[in-house]
């Protein structure tokens, strides 16, 4: 995997956490809250419903009647979950699109497709990849050099000397 910035990594971790929390119930995740149920009623140890003393207290005030509301605040209704899931999916898709577009651009540049990114012929920057015609010349020249090295090696191995003579006109002729 390529190197990611901190923001992308944080978004990925946030997405994984939100995905797992949205699609799993506390019981499925292995979390058990004894005595707290997400319904509007609170139940005692014996299973009988407890009376609602005051419905105007904020959640977490310490009364048994506020415990179900506090628990219900952690478990959002399906409509809110869908909205949060949609927002997260949209942000996650944007990040993935940017990553895939960057990879696609890098592959195009590596292949030499798309011309110069600088926009002008006067750029002094080194090219990211060699031109096709240079590649053909380099390949044929390196093939020629390999053939000559093989001929020279075979001549030395077979006992013949590899000589070069200069004729009267100054040309060099190689003998095997």
Curated annotation (Swiss-Prot):
Biased composition (Low complexity): 56-68
A Pfam family: Hormone_2
Keyword Cell division: no
Subcellular location: Secreted
GO biological process: activation of adenylate cyclase activity; adenylate cyclase-activating G protein-coupled receptor signaling pathway; adenylate cyclase-modulating G protein-coupled receptor signaling pathway; cell-cell signaling; female pregnancy; insulin secretion; negative regulation of cell cycle; neuron projection development
Main location: secreted
Family: Belongs to the glucagon family.
Official protein name in the record: Pituitary adenylate cyclase-activating polypeptide
Natural source organism: Homo sapiens (Human)
Lineage: Eukaryota, Metazoa, Chordata, Craniata, Vertebrata
Designated gene of the protein: ADCYAP1
